[in-house]
Amino acid sequence: MPLTVPKAILFDLDGTLLDTAPDMAASLNRLRVEEGLEPMPPAQIRPHVSNGARGLLAIGLDITPDHEAYQALRDRFLALYAENLAVHTRLFPGLDRLVEELDARLLPWGVVTNKPGGLTRRLLEALALRPAVVVCGDDLNRAKPHPDPLLYAAGKLRLAPDSIWYIGDHERDIVAG
């Protein structure tokens, strides 16, 4: 099958388009300190950032969603993260040039993430990023790995799904794509 030029490019956010690990690790460590625990090395947290709050709470506090304190701790983590959303978060190296080139070529690009919409949109605004479409984990009834978010993004762009490239860093991205 010959490689075709895409009509749009969609990116996962955390760990793909943006290096959010420093701010997410700092927020998890603040929560750990509040809970009387020692901070974890950021390098130990980084591999789990793509798993969102659930994954970070699992490695940082050893709790899962069935734990009675999970929701309260998740809410506290997200509040801490919201306070420090874009302190150290940046585009991964080279992606600033890629985004500029996509804009220059008038090739639409967007974000499809499982991150909550409020955090996603504030983060994109803080970094002065203006994707053509943004689909977040709480925008639809089903998030990735279900394909609905990608199909919804294609619909918003008015493009056939098979004319769009999707770039992600996790198995859920592959399954969704």
Write out the residue ranges for each language-model feature.
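Residue-level marker of regulatory loop/turn positions in helix-turn-helix DNA-binding domains and
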Residues: P2, V112, R142
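Substrate-recognition "cap/lid" segment bordering the active-site pocket of phosphatases
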Residues: V87-R90, P116-A176
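N-terminal helical cap/lid subdomain that shapes the substrate entry/recognition surface
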Residues: P2-R97, A104-R105, P116-R121, R130
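Surface-exposed amphipathic alpha-helices with a cationic face
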Residues: D96-A104, A154, I174-V175
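Generic enzyme active-site microenvironment
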Residues: L10-D12, V112, I167
